[in-house]
Amino acid sequence: MKMKKCPKCGKYTLKDFCSECNEKSVTVKPPRFSPVDKYGKYRRALKKAKM
C-alpha cells in the first residue's frame, strides 16, 4: 500500500481514486531521508495495527 496524491485537488489518500473529486490518484515521491526520523513512531504504530 503506497501513499498517493490527487493531481487535481492535492489531497493525499491511500485509495486509487480521490474521495473529494473522484480523480485518479498518482503515487508521490518518497520523502527525503533524514537520520532523525520524526514520524517513525507513527509508521511503526500503523504497521503494528495492520498486523
Curated annotation (Swiss-Prot):
Intrachain disulfide bonds: none
GO molecular function terms attached to this record: snoRNA binding
Keywords in alphabetical order: Ribonucleoprotein, Ribosome biogenesis, rRNA processing
An annotated GO cellular component: ribonucleoprotein complex
Pfam families reported in the protein's UniProt record: Nop10p
Gene Ontology biological process terms from the UniProt entry: pseudouridine synthesis; rRNA processing
InterPro entries noted in UniProt: H/ACA_rnp_Nop10, H/ACA_rnp_Nop10_sf, Nop10_arc-typ
Segments passing through the bilayer: none
Stored SUPFAM superfamilies: Nop10-like SnoRNP
Family membership noted in the UniProt record: Belongs to the NOP10 family.
Purpose: Involved in ribosome biogenesis; more specifically in 18S rRNA pseudouridylation and in cleavage of pre-rRNA.
Name of the protein in its database record: Ribosome biogenesis protein Nop10
The species this protein was found in: Methanococcus maripaludis (strain DSM 14266 / JCM 13030 / NBRC 101832 / S2 / LL)
Primary gene name: nop10
